[in-house]
Amino acid sequence: MSILDVENLSVSFTEYTKGFRREKRTYISSLDLSVKAGEVVAVVGASGSGKSLLAHAILGILPKNATVGGTIKYNGEILTSSRQKTIRGTEIALIPQSVNFLDPLMKVGKQVQPPVQSGDAKTKQRKVFERYQLKNEVEKMYPFQLSGGMARRVLLSTATVSGAKLIIADEPTPGMDKAVLLEALNSIRELADSGCGVMLITHDIDSALTIADKIAVFYAGTNVETSPAEHFSGNGEKLRHPYSKELWRALPQNDFVGIEGVQPLVSQLPLGCLFEPRCKMATEECKKERPKMRSLRDGMVRCIHAT
């Protein structure tokens, strides 16, 4: 059974437009995704495709002007707002984008301890520090005294000290040098190998492929494909969706050919397939309605032409 099931998720915001008129705009639509215990599912896509919004919806930390549709299930039970609040930080934990998440005025040991709900918090904090090769004296340091790698390990400690079963890593590796990057990725893989379900949100497909079991490709507020990681290989012939193939071929080690056009703005989404205006395979049929996600060759795809 999946530890996380997202079914037909939509996220909309009520916003003020010109003339102080209120308008409801949908940023995520018809999104389906699952994460099993022991696996890393990497969520990749361009900025503005809805990756971080998905994380915030799962955690229940969207702003008050947000409206959420569809269902999110954790261990088979629907995540209501009250349940999200209860298990956030304990059973479901976030590894945030930036080390700026750490309070600059508080010693890091104290920052790691709050998620602990049973047993001695300091003992558990020291145990998780040992796991990530942080000495006891680190607990008395302030964030500015840490190296980049140490700060990342403190964030990992905060996310795992409570024994969380679902870890959401939101762009956890930006700006890292190669050594620190590999260390961070290995730590995330170890979480899955210990039985956690991990959702890794990233722009970096290459890094994701080193640890992910599956890759979910996002475009304009929904996922267009979920594929076994090993299908991202060669010329992308094993991939299903045209956008996934274009994304793969645009990498420097492949054809390094950019994708023509841009991802549409929320206010300018096409009525049919969201990728249709940029797709070389598009037909008139693609303009009529949004394709549904369907199973295909050990993966999932949202395209009527995929075979």
What are these regions (language model features)?
Residues 154, 159-160:
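ABC ATPase C-loop
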Residues 228-307:
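Short catalytic/signature loops enriched in Gly
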Residues 98, 104-118:
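Q-loop/switch helix immediately C-terminal to the Walker
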Residues 67-78:
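Conserved ABC transporter NBD signature motif
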Residues 161-165:
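A short, proline-enriched helix->beta-strand linker immediately N-terminal to the Walker B motif
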Residues 176, 180-254:
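P-loop NTP-binding/switch modules centered on Walker-like glycine-rich loops
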Residues 78-93, 232-239, 268-270:
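ABC ATPase NBD coupling module
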Residues 142-146, 150:
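Conserved ABC ATPase signature
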